[in-house]
Amino acid sequence: SIWVSGVGVALGNALEQIAPVLAQTDYFMPSFDEALQITGKKEPREMAEVLRPFGTRVFIVKLGSRGCFCMDYETGKFCEVPAVPAAHPVSTVGAGDAFCAGMIAALLRGKELRASLEFASAAASMTVQVNHATGAFSSFEEVENYARAAGGRTF
């Protein structure tokens, strides 16, 4: 299972409210603000440590233009993936959703974790360059080509 974001939890007891589902969650991908609300921590590594006992397999916190932080609890490894730079940013509306969609699409195609994070970053980068939340890309291959052109990333 994949928990993306938007649970709408109340301040003060956010972790208590989502704790029961974290053990059934393979990929937990909150935004920085959501992770801050849930954990009370400002640093991604500290956020990851707070969430470790709750059983999610992979914690990914979206950091906007700074990229993302990922902790794979099964391997004990973490990584930070920089954002794919957007040449002409227009609006951040939908960027987090595009990141999650890109992550899910890459994982379902059998991509490794780091490659999936890079792909997700490319999808988010494409999204911030349009004036609406949808329509920035129409295919997996289009995002792959953009990622290669933008940063030489290969999948």
Language model: regions and residue ranges:
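Conserved beta-alpha-beta core of the PfkB/ribokinase-like small-molecule kinase fold
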Residues: S1-E49, R66-C68
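Conserved phosphate-binding/catalytic region of the ribokinase-like
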Residues: L11, P44-F155
